[in-house]
Structure formats: C-alpha cells, structure tokens
Amino acid sequence: MSEPEVTYSTVRLHKSSGLQRLVSHEEIQGPGEAGYRKCSVPWQLTVRSLGIFCFLLLVTVAVLAVKIFQYSQHKQEIHETLNHNHNCSNMQSDIKLKEEMLRNKSIDCSPGEELLESLNREQNRWYSETKTDLDSSQDTGTGVKHWFCYGTKCFYFIMSKNTWSGCKQTCQHYSLPLVKIEDEDELKFLQFQVISDSYWIGLSYDKKKKQWAWIDNGPSKLDMKTRKMNFKPGGCIFLSKTRLEDTNCNNSYFCICGKKLDHFPG
C-alpha cells in the first residue's frame, strides 16, 4: 500500500490599503506618541479650568481690596467726625468757661465802677464849691482860664501874672495852694496841658532848712528828679511846656493852683 500524497500550499492574505496605512502609521508613531495623543484632551481641560479659577480668584481679591479700602475710608471719616464733635464740645466748654469768667469779672468790676462814679461826683462837687468861690471873687484882673482834674487832684490855671509869693497868696485866697507835683506822670500831664508860657508851682528854696521844699513841706516822688537838676539855691521853680527851671522868685508868671480831694468816697 502506498502512502497518500500530501500537498502543501501557501495562503497569502492581502490587507486593504486603509488598514495598511493605519498600521504603518501606528508603527511609525510608536507607542509613546500614541499615548500622548490620547492624554492631550484632559490636560487642556485642566489648564482651562485653572485659568478660569485664577481669574475668579483675582476678581475676588480685587473686590475684597475695594471693600477693605471703602471700609478704611468709612472708618477714617467716622474717626474724623468723632474728633470734630470732641473739638466742638471742647470749644463749647471753653466758651462757657470764658463767659463765666466774664460774668465774674463784671461782678468784680462793679464795685470799681461804683467807686469811679462816686469819685467823679465828689470831684464835680468839689469843683462846684471852689468855682463858686472863684466866681464870687471881687478881685479884678484875676480869673481862671481853665481847670481840669487828674486822678484825685484838680488843677486851676490863674491867668494873671504875679510873683511867686503873689501866686501863693492868690491861690490861698481861693482856699487853694500852689500846685504840688506828685510824680513824673503828673508832671508830664501838666506839661501837656499848659500853653506856651511859664507858671509858678509850689516848689521853692527853704533858706532855713537850706533845701528845696514843696508848699506843704511834704515829700514828692519828683524829689529825685529835682535833685538831679542842680537848681541854684535861693530861687523858686516855674513850669513850662518843656522843663522845670529855677529863677528869681520876684519874676512874674501865671499861677497853677491845685488841690487833692480830701478822701476817696466810700
């Protein structure tokens, strides 16, 4: 018996062109590139999500910054308003305090004003009495040109020239002494009042005491000034608009009589 013959044949399958291109393309790209391509879509979504989140975060931060700034401004305005109200309150307190001080000062000044009014009434009364004596004088050629008061003293200008002794007698006739100048201020005041002429005052040289003496033999705050003037012994002092000067007592000048009030009215 003979063995059966075995016939071998080769089967070749022809791939389609599309499938061949796909296979060849995958073979060319390799496995890494294919995986990257598969993952590229989720990565883009992540980036976009992060971008949107960052934008929203920036917007939120900006809104918060604006709110914080507005809160800070509002807080500052409230603080300034409170300070202004506090300052106004302090000013009102100061005004009330000053008003109270003014009221107290007005109360304190009331006795002084009453004293001044009483003093003026006393001066006017004294002048009225003295003026009556002067007006009733029978002497001719003698009169008062003007008079005025300074402090508690009144002055009378006798516009009739006479010697120092004659002026002394004229003033005494009206119950007035020759004027005694109490201090520097009174001297300046009298010099401001006098016209361009010379007037006897109540200062002369006392030959017995060998010193200058006022008509009442009392002291004066003007003594220091008169000592510095180095008046010559033996004379009398006259007053002009610019100076005090010693001269012969027999010279003829106008007279200034003066008298203090007896007391401050109580």
UniProtKB/Swiss-Prot annotation:
The keyword Glycoprotein applies. It is a single-pass type II membrane protein. One of its GO terms (molecular function) is carbohydrate binding. Residues 143-261 form the C-type lectin domain. Signal peptide: none annotated. Mostly expressed in NK cells, but also observed on NK T and memory T-cells. Homodimer; disulfide-linked. Receptor on natural killer (NK) cells for class I MHC. This is Killer cell lectin-like receptor 5.
